């Protein structure tokens, strides 16, 4: 056994030595700038010109991400299928939605999703703000019938009225379905 290990070590040294060549001693490395950018550290926040991130939006988005009132049965939140405790993904083979209905796929992670070129497995949403709105009205997922019903539930809550006003200051009517998506998107960014 010792002889084999010694032989393997000598072969390894011989191969390592074969890769060395005399010269200036400096390695010349050419790196494509696109490749370098692809492997650089991710930014702390994925910036969006259309949805500047603020602390108030993040706070509202966090609250909405865990809000079960966004589902028809008042029992499913974004976190139900994108569990932050499971790295923002679903732990099952397929996602379970309204009244136990099974989705066609499992939910992709929301971690770093704002850096993706498109959302959903099929790319049908351009950004996390648009993606956040889809499952709420999907009859298999959260099953709300329409955006006005979703917003009616939130308008009935004084705390949400104040949080939307703080997150979208200066807007005449900050409590909109689009702003719901912007807030969740800010939290995911």
Model-flagged regions — what are they?
Residues 2-7, 17-189:
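Periplasmic c-type cytochrome electron-transfer domains
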């Amino acid at each position: 056994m010792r002889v084999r290990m010694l032989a393997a070590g000598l072969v390894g040294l011989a191969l390592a030595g074969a890769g060395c060549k005399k010269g200036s001693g400096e390695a010349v490395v050419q790196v494509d700038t696109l490749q370098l950018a692809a492997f650089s550290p991710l930014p702390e926040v994925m910036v969006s010109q259309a949805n500047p991130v603020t602390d108030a939006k993040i706070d509202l988005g966090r609250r909405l991400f865990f809000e079960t009132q966004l589902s028809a049965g008042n029992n499913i939140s974004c976190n139900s299928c994108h569990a932050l405790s499971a790295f923002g993904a679903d732990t099952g083979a397929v996602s379970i939605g309204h009244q136990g209905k099974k989705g066609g796929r499992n939910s992709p992670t929301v971690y770093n999703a704002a850096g993706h070129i498109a959302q959903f497995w099929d790319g049908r949403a351009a950004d996390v703000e648009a993606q956040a709105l889809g499952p709420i009205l999907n009859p298999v997922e959260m099953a709300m019938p329409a955006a006005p019903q979703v917003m009616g539930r939130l308008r009935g809550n004084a705390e949400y009225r104040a949080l939307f006003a703080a997150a979208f200051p200066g807007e005449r009517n900050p409590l909109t379905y689009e702003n719901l998506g912007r807030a969740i998107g800010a939290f995911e960014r």
